[in-house]
Amino acid sequence: MRRLTLWVRTASTATLVGVGVVVAAVFVAANAVASLDRTGAQPPAPASLAELTLRELGGNGPEGITANFRYANALVPTTSLVPQASAGGSPLPLVTGASGRLWYTNGRLRMEFQTDQGDTQLVVRGTRALMYDASDGTAFAATLPSIATLGRIRTGLAGASQLLGRVRSSLAISTPHPGVTAGRPSYTVHMAPVESPGLLSKVALSVDADTGTPLLLDVYGRRQTKPLVEFALSNVHYGAVDPSVFKLKLPFGMQPVPVRFGGPPSLGATVSCTAPPTLGGLPLQSCREASRSGELPGRLLIYGRSFGSVVVLEQPGGGDPGGGLWALLPGVSVGGAEGRELVTPLGAVVRFARGGVTYTVLGSMPHAVVEAVARGL
């Protein structure tokens, strides 16, 4: 003790300050670790994939969700997207990603994408959506396609094991891994296409073990070490959400620009097909009638199998294939016909008109394969 006292008396001020800082840092770190041990979430008990599937599809979910989110999208190369899709020199957050806040309850969603140029607000109520971009003062209103598949699964699930049996023929799904995500007990599942030549490598999904809420979604392309798309929640809180949150007031006198989304076509019976038996090295697997309400029936062709397939939608009428939202995409020539095209690390889509028919060709395949199918039609 006397030696310690002597050292303290003879040590320089700088030495004493340095020792004091180290001791304080160790004390703070120890208390932080102890706090985590007391209040931190713990991984849930192991669960089989069938148990987790039944819990996810059969549960009702929380009353409401309030959370921060981080959204990153490296799919769409902004240099190839026309300038109309950017505002103030900064691409729209829906294209490149952003961070922000979200609220959700009973089919209603509000998201605030926060950027340096100004926030973008998105409110969805059922099939109606309203978006306001403060960076350039524009608003859009849309009616989204109605998709009732999830509701049918929730009310008519005969058995999670049977459902998984059908899915596993084309998708390899890992055993749920217990862990902690966004401060919540969670299960993480990895999914990858089975023997697919397509560009999708795998999808990683983490869900809340208690509520089934998706907490983290990562989508990877082939030969990609980082996710091409990521959506992550943080600071998640469950409970009632004030209904006023979902009321978005536009500036006085502003009228939103209407945007139309065509719903998915209804598929009919298999029909006789005069399409080429092979395109882009892929065999023709299916040819079915496809139609939308109020439109002449067309055809839906599928070349290849599962995730390694290219889908062709043929619609009667040789209207402008670059109208509406398609006008945002770069132009392309397909066998002398002008069209629109979008190429991403996860696949490509080509749309053009020829001979009184509008063709939409898409697939999670290399760009050259999708274009070869389009040119062979």
Q: Which role fits each region the language model picked out?
A:
Residues 74-98, 260-357, 364-375:
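Short, solvent-exposed recognition patches
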Residues 23-56:
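C-terminal region of N-terminal signal peptides and the immediate post-cleavage residues
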